[in-house]
Amino acid sequence: MTPELRHMLRDDDLNHEEQKQVLELAIKFHHDRFYKQPFAGPQAVAVLFDKPSTRTRSSFSIGVAELGGYPLVIDKSGSQLGRGEPVADTARVLNRMAYGVVWRTFGQGRVEEMAKYSTHPVVNALTDDFHPCQILADFQTIAEHRGGVDNLKNQTIAYLGDAANNMANSYLLGGAVAGMDVRVAGPYGYLPRPDIVADAKRVAAETGGSILVTTDAKEAVKDADCVFTDTWVSMGEEAEYAIRSKPFWDYQVNTELMALAKPDALFQHCLPAYRGKEVTAEVIDGPQSVVWDEAENRLHAQKALLTWLTGKARGDESLLA
């Protein structure tokens, strides 16, 4: 197998078969947390944070350690990136020390520049535009509740709320890669960028999926297999909550809206959740909610992704399955 440097910067960086490989590997890690250990020595993976995190920080820190590596966790305040050092310079330094870079930051262009200058895999752990690691965990959760990865193609998923945010973008692209029927609903002024919708439709045409963007929450949820939402206010916008939340009340996931989905529909939320706002307590704490499985699967999905990317970079086929 020829070594091939690959990155995970947005959800369509994996094709349909590659996404299946990663998800199958994630399920294996769920059954055996030490299924594979691609890092030895231990070899370091740089885990950089420009934004606060609970799930991303804990899952990548624990995950890299369980893969046999050393998670070099650096916050913005502890990095020269936080003082304006060029991304390219940071990448060149980390090339000499680390075996991969995981970065939770703001602009998508920052992780893309890191990848441009990196000689090791770079993983987008969240940007303003995309959250691909979360989507892998979400799809792993669906697969585990629906009889396997092959059944993802049969799923209809609905995302409600701020449809212009990173989660909506990633559901569009990641769902298209999986061959799902993806529905995204939000109010006018909070819909996905046309270029992302166009990319999702192009991929869906290749995989047999479909894309629907609408302002009608009921249309999106009708007969859906899984319903997703996210906080209405992203990090850094908390002071604007009263103003920003006004357009979203019709998209609150409650028992009435869930009743329009299939009777066995799942509910997922990437967390943190605000009960009584984007979702009611009856739903997130109810029998259809799988949010804690979803949160745990961040660990397994990210370990699978790092293992797969490392296998590609080393030309080691044994790490791909």
Curated annotation (Swiss-Prot):
PANTHER family reported in the protein's UniProt record: ORNITHINE CARBAMOYLTRANSFERASE, MITOCHONDRIAL, ORNITHINE TRANSCARBAMYLASE, MITOCHONDRIAL
Xref: HAMAP family = OTCase
Broadest EC class?
transferase
UniProt pathway: Amino-acid biosynthesis; L-arginine biosynthesis; L-arginine from L-ornithine and carbamoyl phosphate: step 1/3
A molecular function (GO) held by this record is: amino acid binding
What span is annotated as the signal peptide, if there is one?
none
Cellular-component GO terms for this entry: cytoplasm
The record's comment on protein family reads:
Belongs to the aspartate/ornithine carbamoyltransferase superfamily. OTCase family.
Where is it chiefly localized? Answer: cytoplasm
Which positions does UniProt annotate for carbamoyl phosphate binding? 53-56, 80, 104, 131-134, 270-271, 298
Q: Could you identify this protein by its name?
A: Ornithine carbamoyltransferase
Keywords from the named record: Amino-acid biosynthesis, Arginine biosynthesis, Cytoplasm, Transferase
What is the purpose of this protein? Reversibly catalyzes the transfer of the carbamoyl group from carbamoyl phosphate (CP) to the N(epsilon) atom of ornithine (ORN) to produce L-citrulline.
Q: Which reaction does it catalyse?
A: carbamoyl phosphate + L-ornithine = L-citrulline + phosphate + H(+)
Q: Which GO terms describe its biological process?
A: arginine biosynthetic process via ornithine; citrulline biosynthetic process; L-arginine biosynthetic process
- Write down the EC number: 2.1.3.3
What NCBIfam families does this protein map onto?
Answer: orni_carb_tr, PRK00779.1
Query: Which positions, given as ranges, span the membrane?
Result: none
| Matches recorded under InterPro entries | Asp/Orn_carbamoyltranf_P-bd (IPR006132), Asp/Orn_carbamoylTrfase (IPR006130), Asp/Orn_carbamoylTrfase_sf (IPR036901), Asp_carbamoyltransf_Asp/Orn-bd (IPR006131), Orn/put_carbamltrans (IPR002292), OTCase_ArgI (IPR024904)
Q: Which gene specifies this protein's sequence?
A: argF
Q: Which Pfam families match?
A: OTCace, OTCace_N
| Intracellular or extracellular location(s) | Cytoplasm
Q: Which organism is it from?
A: Bifidobacterium longum (strain NCC 2705)
Amino acids binding L-ornithine: 166, 230, 234-235
